[in-house]
Amino acid sequence: KQSFVGYEGRRIRGIGRPHKVDRQEMVGVVAAVRHWMTINHEERLASIEERSGRIIKILGGMEGVEVSMIDNIIGHQPFGVQLRVDEKITGVSLHDIVDKLKAGDPPIWTRVREEEDFMALHIFGLKEGEEEIVGSRIAELLR
């Protein structure tokens, strides 16, 4: 009996116990894949584009601030907002904005990648309405 189980077990190199994956994680993966395969992606992307536009509307027209829509349709984050600030005009740098957003209530975590002169704000991790909180908080820092 033991030699049969040992022999059969050697050939199993899949997901599950050998990789310390439990039932809950497997159910979670199945649920996530089912959700992804049945979601209306056109509606999902249209909503993200619209919500990105809300941030642009809040920040657009501010002196020393340039905002534009990220429309990388072939990327994994197809929509979002690209924010540039002229520190001489606004008196605040992108790195200052990152630090102040992080220290605020609620904390908002953003970043400016090394060698880039803009902040990319992606909407996918935000709940409906939170894009307005992010846009308003950034606008407060730039006034």
Label each PLM-derived region with a short phrase.
Residues K1-H76:
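Active-site C-terminal subdomain of aminotransferase-like
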Residues I56-E140:
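Conserved C-terminal alpha-helix-loop-beta "cap" of PLP-dependent enzymes
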